[in-house]
Amino acid sequence: MEFLGQLVAWFADPEQWTGHNSIPIHLAGHLALTGFALVGGLVIALPIGLVIGHTGRGAFLAIALANVGRAIPSIAILGIVFPISLRLDLGFGFLPTLIALIALSIPPIVTNTYAALREVDRDLVEAGRGMGMGELQLLTRVELPVGAGLLLAGVRTAAVQVVATASLGAVISADCLGYFVIHGIATHDLPEIFAGALMISGLSLLTELLFALLQRRVISPGLQTTTPLARAEAGIPGF
């Protein structure tokens, strides 16, 4: 109970909410890192996943590289990127952390996008070709709607990983919630360490919840039970 009181007192301290090293500043930095990293990962990984998923070409190499990337520990990625960024005069903090987080987000998006498209029934795709659909139409009107659930699951995984791992940026002076853990360790402040870990965990869980809700809204029950091609054959408007 005494520790819980210290934790509450830490959060209630006005100093934690104002100034350069306040919670709002580091939360904003954390959100900026994760947001830019996820967008960067999508820009790179989504086209790769769509191409190899739709055509099947280069899939073995791309998926093998993605799996290798997933096997590398997050701190190791940061350890690889940081000295390179110093050599290139990219500095400390935001940019090297962002590059590492983008690299971390790519593998789950690539693998899930590929799997989402390859899991679409081939008979459904061939039926679309028989109806005169081009490759782009097949991708956007058949494969993507049917595989959207698995694709979004990959984005969801990447988002949660990025949010949780962004805290490591504090090691190289990036503004993020990990600052409170690092600073707490340096000053032997157990409530601060626990507060930082609590905020990081809470933000990760919130990200998981938001993407779960997004999946439910985007993948409607009707879309899950009725394929786009079936709706077209039935003459349902909007196809």
Language-model segment annotations:
Residues 1-38, 85:
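Periplasmic/extracellular loop-to-transmembrane helix junction in inner-membrane transport proteins
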Residues 1-10, 21, 209-239:
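Transmembrane alpha-helical segments of polytopic membrane transport and secretion proteins
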Residues 22-33, 80-108, 148, 192, ...:
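Loop-to-helix entry region at the N-terminal start of transmembrane alpha-helices
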Residues 35, 135-168, 195, 211:
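Transmembrane alpha-helices
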Residues 43-48, 62, 96-99, 103-125, ...:
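Membrane-embedded alpha-helices of multi-pass transport/permease systems
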Residues 48-81, 101, 108-115:
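Cytoplasmic-entry segments and transmembrane alpha-helices of multi-pass inner-membrane transporters
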Residues 117-147, 175:
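Short helix-to-coil transition segments within interhelical loops
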Residues 177-214:
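Hydrophobic alpha-helical transmembrane segments of polytopic membrane proteins
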